[in-house]
């Protein structure tokens, strides 16, 4: 094993990278509330893992969506557990994100020179809420259907372009298969990709600038 490690070490300088990560200075004022962002990240990873597992059985069609969710809950081995963990971690992600925003705001973590870190964090907050909105509709039950109908109908109040936005979100004039397909694509591909990109930016800026000082 040592020869293999030495081979990689010679080319990638693994030890130098590990030392840089492990030796990063942590200010003495940091407490447990500074871990809230990390909990959001862990919740996101759980979401990705459990969501990916469910894509093997979920069918994003109006006729089969609800039945496929029932199948996951009743017939798939540990399907009930995987979906439950997905739901619980989703709630945890939203809650921890809200608490994280409050912590950053109350400790002044949004001030110069960390404005861009704050902006990426706000974008991540919007993406987190979008996860909830799109995921809520995927079982395509009565609650999901009417939630989608209400949410996608909100932009109709926007002057001039409101009707076009509604049709874009719904994939047509009314809520149907086009809507479910759009929400499924957003929930499983677009939003995770955007979240991963902005999380990387967020972490790199925190790594560069360090944790903000006490008030």
From Swiss-Prot:
Disulfides per UniProt: none
One MF annotation (Gene Ontology) recorded for this entry: electron transporter, transferring electrons within cytochrome b6/f complex of photosystem II activity
Binding site for heme b 1: 100, 202
GO biological process: photosynthesis; respiratory electron transport chain
Positions that bind heme c: 35
CDD domains recorded: Cytochrome_b_N
Residues reported in the UniProt entry to bind heme b 2: 86, 187
Transmembrane segments: 32-52, 90-110, 116-136, 186-206
PANTHER family registered for this protein in UniProt: CYTOCHROME B
Assembly, per entry: The 4 large subunits of the cytochrome b6-f complex are cytochrome b6, subunit IV (17 kDa polypeptide, PetD), cytochrome f and the Rieske protein, while the 4 small subunits are PetG, PetL, PetM and PetN. The complex functions as a dimer.
Family: Belongs to the cytochrome b family. PetB subfamily.
The protein's name: Cytochrome b6
Organism: Porphyra purpurea (Red seaweed)
Biological classification of the source: Eukaryota, Rhodophyta, Bangiophyceae, Bangiales, Bangiaceae
Gene, per the UniProt record: petB
